[in-house]
Amino acid sequence: MVYQNIVAGRFVDRPNRFIAHVEINGVVETVHVKNTGRCRELLLPGVRVILEVAANPDRKTKYDLIAVYKQGFGLINMDSQAPNKVVAEWLAGQGYDVVKPEYKYGSSRIDFYMEKFRMDDGGQEVSERYLMEVKGCTLEIDGIGYFPDAPTERGIKHLKELAGAAGQGYHCIMAYVIQMEGINEVRPNITTHPAYGKAVEEAIAAGVKVLFLCTAVKENELRIVSGRYLGE
């Protein structure tokens, strides 16, 4: 995915989850933060941030904060809407016959439903069904990615839905889009949310596969370049 109109600024502060103050060309602007996570290790006073100019000129906030240069690391895309967009682009080239976003399953909406058609030994067409939930990883500690950066009961619910679906014959995938370069693994952040780590273990035991999606990150672009399943 490509951002159409970007500018750079310096982070000042973050009054709440939704907005931040950023100095752009010498003027402190109130901007929308496209990530409601904590991001405390990223948004430090004075760091260089990247913003997209809002398409609607009449919007109250004229900019979206989409990326940040982490001190001692490099550029990290922190747009929480980006992972699903880049996965949709990536899935289009993965040989699936059907790809449906926002698929209703059980009491949740799973990010993607996919199908692949094949012929069985008797010459009959059969469908392989897939469910994929997508999470974005922006937390890096000592060269390893971690998720989540804040407790997420919703994330646990999705893992349980995938585990149940695996028992019903679906191929279930928990995909982590790593929104930074140089990282190829994501571990459960049991320090922040021990229950999430347990839910991941239970999902894997039920047959859910964990997929790490590595990206190329530029100020105006995020793109998946490779994928690797846990254990490969």
What role is predicted for each listed range?
Residues P45-N56, C214-T215:
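Flexible glycine-rich surface loops and low-complexity tracts that mediate binding to linear polymers
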Residues Q179-E232:
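Domain-level recognition of nuclease-like catalytic cores that cleave nucleotide substrates
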Residues R40, Q71-P101, D120:
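Acidic-basic catalytic patches of nuclease active cores, encompassing PD-(D/E)XK
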Residues N56-G72:
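OB-fold/S1-family single-stranded nucleic acid-binding modules
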Residues G9, I110-R118, S127-D149, L162:
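Conserved catalytic cores of phosphodiester-cleaving nucleases, focusing on short active-site segments
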Residues G143-E153, A163-T192, C214:
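Nucleic-acid nuclease catalytic cores
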Residues V27-E41:
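Beta-strand/loop nucleic-acid-binding surfaces
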